[in-house]
Amino acid sequence: MSLATAQSARGPAKRRFRDTQIEMAHGAGGKASRRLIDGLIAPHFANPVLDAMADAARLPFGGATLATTADGFVVKPLQFPGGSIGELAVNGTLNDLAVSGAKPLALMATFILEAGLDVAVLEREIAAMATAAGRAGVPILGGDTKVVEHGMADGMYVSTFGIGTVDARVRLDPESIRPGDRVLLSGPIGDHGITILLARGELALEADLRSDTRSVWPYVEALLELCAADIRWMRDPTRGGVATALNELIDGSPYGIALFEEALPVNDMVRGACELLGLDVLHIANEGQFLAVVAPGAEDAALATLRAMPGGERATCIGEVRTEPRARVLGVSSFGGTRVIDMLVGDPLPRIC
């Protein structure tokens, strides 16, 4: 989650940050992250572009609109089934641009390396970044490298910057959502977070599970070609998961969201791990999925388009915008039962990206 994702522009007035120390939860993408950004960081950097609080900043430039975004990656372990820190860094940055309606143009990367890091590991991650960027047709134009003493970093950290051009047809705005709009999800959730947990050996389970890390731009581009005017909002539900992303959307809104819990696409292994650990899959991070709120008339065509693409077969409608309850996400079961779905609290899975 980038700096801007912490608060919708319609959210409540910012409050002073009163925590006296930084804790792991401040980086988890949930309520603590929001307090840090709203109460400490954003007030110092306040400007009209930042105040829009989108996944990427939009800047008019020569008759076009540019989108810029930055991200940092501290995942542990560095390599895991389905990906690694290098691939994650590229895809995560591309995705922040994509869900802002921007075609990625270029990236930059900064490496913080720990003395003693095996050069073979560094080269592996640089190669992974080159492969992921090449797959997306996006060059990495430059960056920086710093080295810190042994024991002062966990092998390596990666920071990225991305720039893209916003499609002229895009009118993404949380305030544009209306009752009846559909909430679409591109595919199964929870794979990345649970994969990282298993890769650490913290759970005595064996599973054929892989991170979902990928660029979502091809899917977003297909939707823009199909129905750009009918797309109200998009977001990639990384840290904090689907629950946090949807709560950010309706924060301060006159509307709420009904989330159809039985419709959520979740792999059996992920569901089982969440039940075993007492985790809510809606709070688990994803690195290759996105949410889109679309006008009701666009739902069928949008889903058909996504499902026709490799990797989009399980795209589905998981909810709709409603007049009640205001500014809340309400989970609805197949039996008609309901529960309030809040943003992530705490940090159940630290350093997952």
Which sequence ranges carry the predicted segments?
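Helix-biased detector of long, well-ordered alpha-helical tracts
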Residues: M1-C353
